[in-house]
Structure formats: structure tokens, C-alpha cells
């Protein structure tokens, strides 16, 4: 699977080069809702996984948040940094290249919230996802929020294309990991799920879960 994710990186690099506005210029609806949830708790320090072309990271920065944004595509990181400079947001946005399979380069309890939009749908095994979620939990402050979206097993593309194991299918060269409710519960690892709902996005449309979890006091408990 490591080789497959490495191949996916090359595919995304090419995609970003050919279509710099692939996901549109404005923020995602998930990004807007995440901002509302984080702001309601008077939190400001956000870590975004898989920033892509930066639309949500830049939106968060424009709305008063301090954002560290990670992506495994060098082209994506460069594009986010360039856009932040153009918008005079460099002081609020720090873009870094990072592979989610590696430990996060931050100290424990560094952030108020972690956020990602469809990042966990990449070609990651369940074990790799569990590692990534544990790392997110490690860098969250007490009662911090982990907000993410994933495509569901009810998505029109689930079951299409080439089966790659563990709920993953390759469609048009992209490997997508589809989530059922059981996987969402498993990855929560006892943390409180404070928001959970299904929604649609795009022309297909994609069917997604929106999940917001609160870091509990003790790993593996819900208290």
C-alpha cells in the first residue's frame, strides 16, 4: 500500500499542475462549518491535514485563525504559500510538506483543532488511519476538536472501479477509501463525537460524512 500511496502522490502532483483550480476558489462548506465550530469555542490554532490547493486554509486565515497546513504534494505546498503571500496572509498560514504516515512534526498539545476535508479518503490502510488519528489526538490540546469529512460507503463511486482492499476502490486513477459508520466509531477511539451527519457535494454528487470529535481526557475513553 505504501507504493500505491506514493504513486498517488505523483498522480496528484500532475493533477494540480494541469488544473490549479480543481476544487474551486472558494472554501468548502465543510471548511465553513468547521470555522463556525472552532470559533464558537474561542479557539484559534488550527492544523489542517491535506490542504490541497489551500481554499480552506486561506479561508480560515482570513477569518482570524492561525493555520498550519500540511500536504504531501510539494506543488500544493508551494501553491498555498504563494497564495498566502499574495493575499498578505503569510503571518497566519504556514504550509509544510508532510506524509500522514509519518509522525507529526509538532509537540504534544500544540493545537486547538485539527481539520481535513476528504483527506482520509486517500489510499491509506485502516492501520495507517489509526496512526494518523492517534497523532492528531496527540497534538490536540485538552478538549480540542478533530473535524473531518470522508466519502461514505453510500457514495456512487463505492464499489466502482478496481477494488484495492479495506474499502478502497480505484476510479479514474484515484484510489478512494470509503467509510462506513463502524469505521468512524472505530477511529474515534473513545473520543466524544459531537457532530455527525451525512451531506452531498459536487456534481456526482459525492456522499460524505461530516465528523467533529472532542478529545477526551484519557485515550480510549469517552469521559
At which residue positions do the language-model features occur?
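Class I (Rossmann-like) S-adenosyl-L-methionine-dependent methyltransferase catalytic domain
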Residues: 1-41, 46-47, 52-102, 131, ...
Amino acid at each position: 500500500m505504501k507504493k500505491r500511496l506514493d504513486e498517488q502522490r505523483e498522480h496528484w502532483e500532475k493533477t494540480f499542475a494541469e488544473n490549479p483550480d480543481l476544487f474551486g476558489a472558494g472554501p468548502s462548506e465543510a471548511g465553513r462549518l468547521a470555522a463556525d465550530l472552532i470559533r464558537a469555542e474561542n479557539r484559534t490554532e488550527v492544523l489542517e491535514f491535506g490542504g490541497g490547493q489551500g481554499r480552506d486554509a486561506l479561508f480560515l486565515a482570513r477569518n482570524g485563525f492561525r493555520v498550519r497546513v500540511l500536504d504531501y504534494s510539494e506543488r500544493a505546498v508551494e501553491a498555498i504559500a504563494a497564495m498566502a503571500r499574495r493575499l498578505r496572509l503569510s503571518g497566519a498560514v504556514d504550509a509544510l510538506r508532510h506524509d500522514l504516515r509519518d509522525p507529526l512534526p509538532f509537540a504534544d498539545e500544540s493545537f486547538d483543532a485539527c481539520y481535513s476535508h476528504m483527506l482520509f479518503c486517500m489510499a491509506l490502510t485502516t492501520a495507517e488511519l489509526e496512526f494518523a488519528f492517534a497523532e492528531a489526538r496527540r497534538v490536540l490540546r485538552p478538549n480540542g476538536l478533530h473535524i473531518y469529512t470522508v466519502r461514505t460507503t453510500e457514495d456512487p463511486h463505492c464499489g466502482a472501479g478496481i477494488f484495492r482492499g479495506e474499502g478502497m476502490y480505484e476510479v479514474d486513477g484515484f484510489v478512494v477509501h470509503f467509510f462506513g459508520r463502524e469505521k468512524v466509531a472505530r477511529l474515534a477511539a473513545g473520543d466524544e463525537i459531537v457532530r455527525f451527519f451525512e451531506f452531498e457535494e459536487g456534481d456526482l454528487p459525492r456522499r460524505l460524512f461530516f465528523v467533529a470529535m472532542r478529545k477526551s481526557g484519557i485515550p480510549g475513553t469517552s469521559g
